[in-house]
Amino acid sequence: MEKGNYAFIDSQNLNLGTQKMGWKMDWRKFRIMLREKYNVTKAYMFIGHMPEFEDMYMQMHDLGFLVVLKPTQNLKPKVEKPDTKDSEPEEKKPIKGNIDADLVLWTMREIGNYDKAIIVSGDGDFYGLIEYLDEQKKLLHVMAPNWQYSSLLKPYENYIVRIDQLRRELAYFSRKKKQPVKK
């Protein structure tokens, strides 16, 4: 019996990589494509956890992704500000939810359960994982969000699928009806 393939998705790399190219991913279309084109039976989505996005995590789960949440950290130190009307609004704090170790761990932990793996990231931090999967004949593809993937991945160009080249198939379009322009 064929095991099927698994996808391991660096959601931040994918999301930022497509947005940088001026579009948003339609996650439903992406999951369907993974299943139909690449026989992906399980798609693990690694995301830095932020409580205000609980609904999004549930939506991703409902679309067929196995959501793996990683605790996040605020990178800016807390600074007490005086409470005055003239004080500037607080800057948005950068949040870091480093999922790299989790993605590698889950890929290795599940290695006996899938035929081949798809790593969805253009991040060179996954070079060692990709190298190992290739040596074990377990690598199907590396799906990079755009042409700006890490030069460390160049030896694996034969495995690279650029998601930006699939924009027409995978882009999200708002389904809201546009209001007619009044003349």
Give the residues covered by each predicted segment.
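Terminal and domain-boundary accessory regions
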Residues: 1-183
